[in-house]
């Protein structure tokens, strides 16, 4: 299952994120895409880790309460790395976590929250997918004889392991 391929259509992506916010059970499995159930299960399993990343006292929740979403999502989305399925699923689960825990006293209506989260996230996913396709379509001759920028900047020790971020372990 390729999460980015499944999420190419905005309405499908939106439905998956919406479905993942429901409690586990027959309704979620029957009504929504199978990916919504997978993402929802990840959220339930990893909720403690998400709370470590964004505790209840974090400024993000105050911004959401006041209806400010552009700045937080700009910060979240610019650092987004989607090079493997684990990170893709973790990102979708994080979006679901944000929606599940959005402050109930927010000035943003429940219906608008979904689009405030999904629109910028889906746009970023599309940009990431297009860039990955372009890089994959480049002929091998472009890369011959060139050292890796990552190797030069980061050193070998960073190439052998995954991200230090607890969300993406």
Curated annotation (Swiss-Prot):
Family matches, as Pfam families: Adeno_E1B_19K (PF01691)
UniProt keyword annotations, A-Z: Early protein, Host-virus interaction, Inhibition of host apoptosis by viral BCL2-like protein, Modulation of host cell apoptosis by virus
Coiled coil location: none
A GO biological-process term: symbiont-mediated suppression of host apoptosis
Domain of life: Viruses
Family: Belongs to the adenoviridae E1B 19 kDa protein family.
Protein name as annotated: E1B protein, small T-antigen
Organism of this sequence: Canine adenovirus serotype 1 (strain CLL) (CAdV-1)
């Amino acid at each position: 299952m390729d999460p980015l391929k499944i999420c190419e259509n905005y309405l499908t992506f939106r439905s998956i994120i919406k479905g993942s916010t429901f409690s586990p059970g027959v309704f979620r499995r029957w009504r929504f895409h199978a990916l919504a159930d997978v993402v929802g299960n990840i959220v339930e399993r990893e909720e403690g880790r998400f709370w470590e990343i964004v505790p209840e006292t974090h400024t993000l929740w105050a911004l959401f309460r006041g209806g400010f979403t552009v700045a937080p999502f700009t910060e979240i989305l610019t650092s987004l790395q989607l090079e493997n399925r684990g990170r893709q699923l973790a990102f979708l689960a994080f979006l679901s976590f944000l929606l599940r825990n959005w402050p109930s006293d927010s000035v943003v209506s429940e219906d608008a929250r979904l689009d405030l989260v999904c629109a910028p996230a889906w746009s970023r996913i599309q940009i990431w997918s297009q860039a990955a396709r372009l890089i994959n379509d480049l002929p091998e001759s472009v890369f011959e004889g060139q050292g890796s920028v990552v190797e030069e900047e980061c050193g070998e020790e960073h190439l052998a392991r995954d991200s230090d971020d607890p969300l993406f372990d």
